[in-house]
Each structure stands twice: as structure tokens, then as C-alpha cells.
From Swiss-Prot:
Name of protein: Lipoyl synthase, mitochondrial
Binding residues annotated for [4Fe-4S] cluster 2, in chain numbering: 152, 156, 159
Species annotation: Komagataella phaffii (strain GS115 / ATCC 20864) (Yeast)
Organism superkingdom: Eukaryota
Biased segments, Basic residues type: 44-53
Alphabetical list of NCBIfam families matching this protein: lipA, PRK05481.1, PRK12928.1
Homology family: Belongs to the radical SAM superfamily. Lipoyl synthase family.
């Protein structure tokens, strides 16, 4: 049994003497503890000591000077960055590498966007194709304008766009500025997208529709694709946008149904997204409807196939597949880097199921320009009221031509791999 020695203190202890009293009592307890069990006191003293720094630990357990002299140190290094440099499996696959953005067209687009205070999903979402899309010839260069600011009210686990519950209100001059910028570039096809604005009563539907109208007023020849949110499931707002003069209505499923709750914001559901695409088609049957899926989250083939069936059941015309790329360490990890041959498989499968067009590849994104030339031809023919049978035949011929070009690109990617 431990004995306790009582330290007699004055009855009246004032101010700073209280701390002295507590210290004396502590020393008394320590002394009695030492007399009873010296090993316990040693343990307490070890805990009280300052813990060694990480650097000190690494110096003690890491390579010694002799290890560096003999060359053994290189086998003892555990630095993750060093391991990644030396391990090919820890690095990005060769087919996911892109060139540094450059060129006159690239800098011209960037300058105009800054001058007119416009945001693009190309920059905000760190798209790997920015150099290709912005750096093309004037008639080919494309920028996906992100409307209603650069801050989203949702926080999906794959997206690097800034989030805030109460972002700044939309710029009332944005529709006019956007139309002005696009008319300057002399584009034939433009993509408009938007952050989710759950803070707005209409989800921003009227702002988007106004922007499309302004663009058509300034440059009626330009084809407009609008990649919208789900308007919190308000299908009337989806119909407002679909009834504007746009040509392609796009809304992304992002992933398969089973993974949606783990990847997208809780306010975005798989069935809700399907309803938005269906409502747009019903409001304007002549619209081309489009969606996009990212692969690499751990989805199965059966899940992807079921998603394609769900899209065909609502008459979705276009689907794209791309590789999920982790924007930062705070976002969801990549489960798998899908090979180019697997992307080719899903493209063929989608076309077999009756999709009008499918762009599928590691670097393909929902607004990637690869399919725009084909979609342009489809829209123009629909505008001129070409017969359905003749239209389908032309579409098939154009699609086969485009597929042959993509096959050449895939073959090159495989060769690089």
C-alpha cells in the first residue's frame, strides 16, 4: 500500500503562495511514490520529457554516415516522393500526360476572359485538355464558360470548384459580356456550364436562358450547348432552359447509381438527374440531350451497362466517358486508371445501344471538343428538316468517319503505352 506524507502548510495562503503549496504537495506525493514503487516514477518522468522531433527520430533510425559511404542508403530511403519517382506503377500512366498549355490562341482567350470577368470550367476544374481546346485555330478553339460565378453551393468529392453556402449574387451583366466574348472569338460551337446555385429560387435557370438568348442575338450562327445543374429537381426550371434557343442540353450523371451517394453531393441523386434529362427532351424533342460519366471510381461493368440502359430509356442522344483524375489530396482517391482499350470498348457498346454519338477516352471530358463537329452536323440537318431515314443514314456515315479517326488516335495511345 502506498503511504502518503502530509505536508503542513500555513492556514492562510494568499495569491502566489497557492501555487507554491500545490508544488510542495506534488513533490511530497512524488517522494512517497518513489519510496513505494521507483519504476512508476521513472515512467512518469519519461512521459514528462519533451518528445523527440520527427527529424530526430529519422536521424536515429535512418541511414548512418557509413551507409551513405557504402551506398546502402539508397535502399533505405522511404520518402514517398522518391519512391514514386522510381516506381513506374506509382506514376500516372503515359496516356494521361498532356502538353503544357501555350500558343497565341490560348493567351488570346485567357486575356478576353480576364477582361470581361468571366470564369471557365477549364481553369476552375483543372481540365487536362485546356491546352488543346484553347490552343487550337480560331475556328476550332473552344472555352467552356462557367456562368453565375466560380463558387458552387455543393461539394462533390470529385470536383475542385470552390464551395460556399451563400456565394455572391450572379452578375446581371454576365449574359451580355458572355455574348460579347463569344462573338469576338468567331466560334462555331460554344459550351456554357454553371455552378450549382441552390441559393437562388430558380437555380439560375432564367439567367442561363437569358445568356443563350443574348448569344443567339449577337451571333445566330453559333451552336450553343448548355451543361446545367439539376435545379434541385425542379423540372419546370429544366423546361425553362430547354425552351430557350439552345441546341444541346447537357446534364451529367457523373457516375453509376450505386456510387452516386458516395461521390456526389447529397442533394444530387441519380434518379433526379435522369428526370432532368427526360424533362428537357419532353419540353423540346428536337434538342440533342447529352450526359457524361467518369470512370475509375471502382464501378463495375454491369453498373455501367445498367446506366447506359437507363439513359437510352429516356432517349438521351450523346454520352461521354472519361477518366476521373483526383484534383487534390482532399478529394476522392482514384481506384483504377482505365486503359484506352477499355474506353474503346464502352464507346462501341454505347453505339451498339443506339446512342447518336459517344466520345470515350482517358482525357475526354463532358465538354471536350472531340464530338462537336459531329454534333454540329446533326443539329444543322435537324434545322433543315431532313427526313428521319436520310438523316440517320448521314449520321451513321459521319459517325463512322469520326470513329475511324478516333481509332487511329487510340492506336497511337496504345503504342505510347
Amino acid at each position: 500500500m502506498l503511504s502518503t506524507r502530509v505536508v503542513r502548510l500555513p492556514k492562510v495562503i494568499s495569491g502566489g503562495n497557492k501555487q507554491l503549496a500545490r508544488g510542495l504537495a506534488s513533490l511530497s506525493d512524488e517522494k512517497s511514490l518513489n519510496e513505494a514503487n521507483p519504476t512508476d516514477l521513472a515512467g512518469l518522468k519519461r512521459k514528462a520529457k519533451r518528445r523527440p522531433t520527427k527529424l530526430a527520430d529519422e536521424l536515429k533510425t535512418g541511414p548512418s554516415f557509413a551507409d551513405f559511404v557504402t551506398g546502402k542508403a539508397k535502399d533505405m530511403l522511404v520518402d514517398p516522393l522518391e519512391l514514386a519517382r522510381n516506381d513506374p506503377n506509382a506514376r500516372l500512366p503515359s496516356w494521361l500526360k498532356t502538353q503544357i498549355p501555350k500558343g497565341k490562341s490560348f493567351h488570346h482567350l485567357k486575356s478576353d476572359l480576364k477582361e470581361l470577368k468571366l470564369s471557365t470550367v477549364c481553369e476552375e476544374a483543372k481540365c487536362p485538355n485546356i491546352g488543346e481546346c484553347w490552343g487550337g485555330k480560331k475556328s476550332e478553339a473552344t472555352a467552356t464558360i462557367m456562368l453565375m460565378g466560380d463558387t458552387c453551393t455543393r461539394g462533390c468529392r470529385f470536383c475542385s470548384v470552390k464551395t460556399n453556402r451563400n456565394p455572391a449574387p450572379p452578375d446581371p451583366n454576365e449574359p451580355e459580356n458572355t455574348a460579347e466574348a463569344i462573338s469576338r472569338w468567331g466560334l462555331g460551337y460554344v459550351v456554357l456550364t454553371t455552378v450549382d446555385r441552390d441559393d437562388l429560387p430558380d437555380g439560375g435557370a432564367h439567367h442561363l436562358a437569358s445568356t443563350v438568348t443574348k448569344i443567339k442575338e449577337k451571333a445566330p450562327q453559333i451552336l450553343v450547348e448548355c451543361l446545367s445543374g439539376d435545379f434541385r429537381g425542379n423540372l419546370e426550371m429544366a423546361k425553362v432552359l430547354a425552351s430557350s434557343p439552345l441546341d444541346v442540353f447537357a446534364h451529367n450523371l457523373e457516375t453509376v447509381e450505386d456510387l452516386t451517394p458516395h461521390i456526389r453531393d447529397r442533394r444530387a441523386t441519380y434518379r433526379q438527374s435522369l428526370s432532368v434529362l427526360r424533362a428537357a427532351k419532353e419540353a423540346n424533342p428536337r434538342l440533342v440531350t447529352k450526359t457524361s460519366l467518369m470512370l475509375g471510381f471502382g464501378e463495375t461493368d454491369d453498373q455501367i451497362l445498367q446506366t447506359l440502359h437507363d439513359l437510352r430509356n429516356i432517349s438521351c442522344d450523346v454520352v461521354t466517358f472519361g477518366q476521373y483524375m483526383r484534383p487534390t489530396k482532399r478529394h476522392m482517391k482514384v481506384v483504377e486508371y482505365v486503359t484506352p482499350s477499355k474506353f474503346e470498348y464502352w464507346r462501341d457498346k454505347a453505339l451498339e445501344m443506339g446512342f447518336l454519338y459517344c466520345a470515350s477516352g482517358p482525357l475526354v471530358r463532358s465538354s471536350y471538343k472531340a464530338g462537336e463537329a459531329f454534333i454540329e452536323n446533326v443539329i444543322k440537318k435537324r434545322r433543315t428538316n431532313v427526313g428521319a431515314i436520310e438523316e440517320q443514314q448521314h449520321d451513321k456515315e459521319n459517325n463512322n468517319l469520326l470513329l475511324s479517326k478516333e481509332d487511329e488516335k487510340t492506336t497511337q495511345e496504345k503504342a505510347n503505352f
